[in-house]
């Protein structure tokens, strides 16, 4: 009998082990591995607060006031996520603010979102708390003692570590505590209660939905209040995963959206049903923030961590009281003080590391991401090593679209309509990009046919609309049209998700790494469509890209608009913003709240007109556009003019200004293919083209049609099982012709290049007549340059000789240097050009500017004297184009004899001191209003002159000093340019 029992026990144990092994194996199937790596440290602090809620801000402020060094990572592009995200902007009867911060927030109730966001910004700035927007915690750091030692966060600059003694988790669902291994109650399957606010429109009714009209009207800038409806919904949930919440969000919008609405909650509100297990538990009523035991906010068996939110170990009735903003802020102050006190008693964490173990991966490959850091120093950041570890798979689809904007939403719709299992990821909480979230709700130009026409007709199909200030389409309706069409086509939509890496095997992209409010994971896909507008996924996957660098700061102007509730078209151009730089984006949001402080709200999408671009299988140039080049693989017809929002750099435009005439442009499929990578397509501003070609192919109608084409192409890849380069292009074109995206002639088009040599020769002959035919001459330099040299030698007039010398010089040819030198010497300064963003057309160099640049590029010894004579005549009142011209010319010559003259120019009154190295300078030196050229003119002039001085050998360290100041500038393009210039010389 004893033996029998032993056998039973052994058998049972074996079965249990097998079951456990099976579960483990199943878990391992749902992961991939990332190789060992070193993560840059962004901040070393006493206390890190994760989450930009009112409570989180109150905690950060109090901790700082108690002497702690504090950093706050906000998930959204603003602070006040607990108020503005779910639209809980009002106080309930009997709630009265008592603290200074609370009184500022609720000067009126409901509070305007701008009032909330700006007040919280100022609270952190005044307290000396560093903070960033758009940052998701992805991992928890630990030290040798196993103690929590900070977090790892992901944002559009990649992934960075924050070392800290104490962590305050102010996220809605205690995501950091979950990462740290804290124990939580179950999130049961079944129906759960959520709330959603809709402003304007009629009350919706139905099953599992109740509505009440909010007693207080939503205040509108310069107008009457708007009525808000609070919906209470019961929605079936499979579990507490992010995917389940993403699905619930779509169900809630299906049930509550109305054509008359003007705004709505960004996310659902729920009292979390799955609290953590704390050191202590509160089962009764809420005793008040000043009386509650602090141990209910400390996870059991986890030190140095506070949970500041509804997942605390308190009754759900108490949690409801806690999540009211006044109580949350009071509690935040208590927790902030406790965290500061705890940090004071702790030594700094030692041997900080990122825990984790490798898994048996479901597929081979590795995670690629940006680990360059976000600092403004010239030294390498310290780093934290992490061993090889598993990254969970959050989903597997046919097509994943990263970015639901102008190109991404159409790509998702078309891919899903073609039968591909499609997932669209979007960081913001609305689809459509610059035309909706960016408030640029009018077409300037574009090919308004095909899918774009379907969009416009779909929006009109919602019915009559009110007239709005600024005109344009109804952004709420356009967002909803995209969303509903994705839903109809069977696509999934995940809002609040950031693409932060690529999963790659060899040269094939097999998925995208994402950061969600609940953590980091991988979406595996047969095709990735990078619709970030910034080639974010392609860049980290290994695609070669072009952007501002050491060559210059030529970038189209950017904006960030004020938002008036129910408004129409709102276009701004007041700065440069680098989408890849989380510090610069933070600067823009903080400054914009100062610029537009009296309006209802601020837009959440940075309206950049130029971003990082891939080097694709084909790189479109201005010459392709000007010569109406055709291709066998055209998939988009673009229509626009050269609306450059700044200055141009291509030789053709430095010689002959672009005009405002309408141009139709063929865009080939190869512009969407990153050279050397498979499994990925890139859309929007990230496609492969010269920066001076982008103004003509970036119009919204054309990006919408381009996204549609990319989605169809991706579905064809899935169906055929081939690579992105092997699809049947003619079949794709036929579909697009049937859709009316393309004219039928593209089916028989061939590449019209190379141009016949006879055409080049004819153009060289007539180019002396006001540069007629210049676009043909510059299309094939290998054929044109010998002809230009001969034409210069044979020219029988000074005008012709100068024209040929001018072109040759601009191309770096020394032939004709003496002619150019004489022309520069004999002319007085003409009318120059100051930086212009909005409405910039034509030349951005004067005629003399252009001659000076051409002379400098000859690298002739004859060039220096005439150019230095011109430098002496310049001062702070001189136009930017003159300063830019002499800087380009002199740095090209690189003669140390030019250094003293450049230094003397820089020392003239008003030339230097224009870097924004702290946020106070950025806030108060940026003028109010939707446009600004003053600060850009000042900084561009100072920077190009300092760069030229530095490259000419410098003089008494003046150039290096200025460049080092700009290397710390909060404006990302200036900072990267300055750092690159300094690094390039150091490397040499």
Task: Mark where each language-model region is.
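Bacterial N-terminal signal peptides
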Residues: 8-20
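Flavin (FAD/FMN)-binding glycine-rich loop and adjacent Rossmann-like elements that form
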Residues: 24-27, 32-33, 38, 82, ...
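N-terminal Rossmann-fold NAD(P) dinucleotide-binding loop
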Residues: 56, 408
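Conserved N-terminal/central alpha/beta ligand/cofactor-binding core
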Residues: 42, 62, 68-69, 73-143, ...
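Amphipathic alpha-helical scaffolding segments comprising HEAT/armadillo-like alpha-solenoid repeats
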Residues: 751-764, 781-793, 813-837, 860-874, ...
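Beta1/beta-strand and adjacent pyrophosphate-binding region of the FAD-binding site
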Residues: 42-53, 393-405
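Structural detector for internal amphipathic alpha-helices that build alpha-solenoid repeat scaffolds
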Residues: 769-782, 790-794, 798-814, 834-860, ...
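Bacterial N-terminal signal peptides that target proteins for export
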Residues: 1-9
């Amino acid at each position: 009998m004893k033996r029998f029992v032993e056998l039973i026990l052994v058998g049972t144990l074996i079965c249990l082990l097998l079951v456990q092994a099976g579960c483990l194996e199943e878990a391992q199937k749902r992961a991939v591995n990332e190789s060992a790596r070193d993560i840059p440290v962004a901040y070393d602090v006493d206390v890190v607060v994760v989450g930009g809620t009112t409570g989180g801000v109150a905690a950060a402020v109090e901790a700082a006031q108690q002497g702690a060094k504090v950093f706050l990572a906000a998930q959204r592009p603003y602070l006040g996520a607990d108020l503005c995200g779910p639209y809980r902007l009002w106080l309930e009867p009997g709630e009265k603010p008592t603290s200074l911060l609370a009184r500022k927030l609720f000067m009126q109730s409901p509070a305007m979102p701008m009032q909330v966001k700006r007040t919280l910004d100022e609270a952190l700035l005044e307290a000396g708390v560093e903070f960033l927007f758009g940052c998701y915690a992805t991992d928890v750091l630990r030290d040798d003692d196993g103690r929590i030692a900070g977090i790892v966060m992901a944002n559009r600059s990649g992934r960075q570590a924050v070392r800290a003694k104490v962590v305050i988790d102010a996220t809605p669902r205690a995501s950091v505590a979950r990462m740290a291994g804290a124990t939580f109650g179950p999130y049961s399957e079944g129906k759960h209660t959520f709330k959603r606010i809709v402003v304007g429109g009629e009350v919706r009714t139905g099953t599992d939905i109740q509505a009440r009209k909010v007693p207080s009207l939503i205040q509108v800038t310069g107008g009457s209040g708007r009525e808000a409806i609070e919906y209470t919904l019961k929605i079936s949930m499979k579990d507490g995963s992010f995917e389940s919440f993403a699905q619930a969000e779509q169900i809630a919008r299906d049930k509550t959206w109305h054509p008359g609405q003007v705004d709505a909650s960004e996310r659902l509100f729920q009292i979390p049903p799955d609290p953590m297990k704390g050191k202590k538990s509160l089962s009764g009523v809420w005793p008040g923030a000043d009386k509650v035991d602090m141990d209910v906010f400390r996870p059991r068996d986890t030190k140095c961590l506070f949970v500041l939110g509804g997942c605390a170990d308190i009754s759900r009735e108490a949690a409801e009281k806690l999540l009211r903003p006044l109580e949350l802020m009071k509690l935040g102050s208590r927790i902030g003080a406790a965290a500061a006190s705890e940090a004071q008693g702790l030594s700094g964490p030692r041997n900080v590391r990122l825990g984790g173990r490798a898994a048996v991966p479901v597929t081979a490959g590795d995670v690629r991401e940006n680990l360059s850091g976000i600092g403004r120093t010239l030294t390498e950041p310290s780093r934290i090593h992490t061993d090889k570890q598993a990254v969970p798979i959050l989903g597997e689809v046919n097509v994943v679209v990263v970015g639901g904007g102008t190109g991404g939403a159409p790509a998702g719709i078309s891919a899903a309509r073609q039968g591909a299992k499609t997932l669209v990821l979007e960081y913001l909480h609305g689809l459509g990009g610059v035309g909706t979230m960016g408030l640029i709700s009018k077409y300037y130009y574009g090919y308004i046919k095909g899918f774009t026409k379907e969009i416009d007709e779909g929006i009109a199909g919602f019915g009559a609309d009110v007239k709005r200030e600024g005109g344009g389409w109804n952004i709420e309706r356009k967002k909803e049209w995209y969303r509903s069409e994705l839903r109809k086509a069977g696509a999934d939509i995940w809002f609040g998700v950031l693409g932060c890496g690529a999963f790659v095997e060899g040269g094939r992209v097999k998925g995208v790494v994402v950061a969600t409010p609940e953590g980091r994971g991988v979406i595996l896909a047969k095709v990735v469509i990078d619709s970030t507008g910034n080639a974010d996924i392609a860049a980290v996957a290994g695609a070669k890209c072009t952007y501002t660098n050491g060559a210059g700061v030529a970038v189209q102007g950017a904006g960030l608009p004020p938002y008036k509730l129910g408004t129409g078209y709102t276009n701004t151009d007041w700065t440069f913003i680098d989408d890849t730089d989380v510090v610069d984006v933070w600067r823009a949001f903080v400054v914009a709240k100062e610029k537009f402080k009296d309006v209802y709200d601020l837009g959440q999408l940075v309206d950049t007109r130029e971003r990082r671009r891939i080097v694709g299988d084909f790189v479109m140039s201005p010459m392709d556009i000007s010569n109406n080049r055709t291709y066998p693989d055209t998939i988009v017809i673009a229509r626009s003019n050269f609306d450059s929002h700044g200055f141009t750099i291509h030789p053709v435009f430095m010689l002959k200004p672009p005009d405002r005439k309408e141009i139709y442009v063929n865009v080939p499929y190869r512009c969407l293919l990153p050279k050397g990578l498979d499994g990925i397509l890139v859309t929007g501003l990230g496609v492969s083209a010269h920066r001076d070609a982008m103004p003509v192919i970036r119009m919204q109608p054309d990006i919408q049609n381009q996204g549609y084409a990319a989605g169809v192409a991706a579905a064809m890849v899935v169906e055929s099982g081939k690579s992105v380069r092997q699809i049947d292009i003619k079949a794709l074109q036929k579909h697009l012709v049937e859709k009316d995206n393309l004219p039928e002639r593209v089916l028989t088009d061939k590449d019209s290049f190379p141009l016949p040599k006879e055409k080049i020769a004819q153009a060289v002959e007539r180019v002396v007549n006001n540069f007629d035919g210049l676009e043909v001459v510059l299309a094939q330099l290998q054929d044109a340059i010998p002809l230009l040299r001969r034409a210069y030698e044979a020219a029988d007039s000074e005008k012709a000789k100068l024209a040929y010398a001018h072109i040759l010089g601009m191309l770096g040819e020394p032939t004709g240097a003496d002619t150019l030198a004489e022309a520069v010497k004999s002319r007085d300064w003409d009318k120059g050009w100051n930086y212009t963003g909005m409405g910039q057309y034509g030349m951005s160099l004067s005629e003399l500017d252009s001659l000076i640049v051409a002379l400098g590029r000859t690298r002739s010894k004859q060039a220096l004297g005439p150019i230095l004579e011109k430098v002496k005549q310049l001062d702070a009142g001189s136009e930017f184009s003159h300063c830019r011209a002499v800087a380009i010319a002199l740095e090209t010559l690189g003669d140390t004899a030019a250094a003293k003259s450049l230094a003397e120019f820089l020392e003239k009154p008003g030339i230097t001191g224009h870097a924004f190295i702290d946020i106070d300078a950025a806030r108060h030196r940026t003028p109010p209003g939707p446009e600004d050229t003053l600060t850009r003119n000042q900084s561009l002039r100072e920077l190009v002159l300092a760069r030229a001085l530095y490259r000419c050998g410098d003089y008494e360290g003046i150039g290096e000093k200025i460049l080092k100041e700009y290397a710390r500038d909060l404006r990302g393009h200036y900072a990267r340019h300055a750092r690159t210039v300094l690094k390039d010389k150091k490397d040499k």
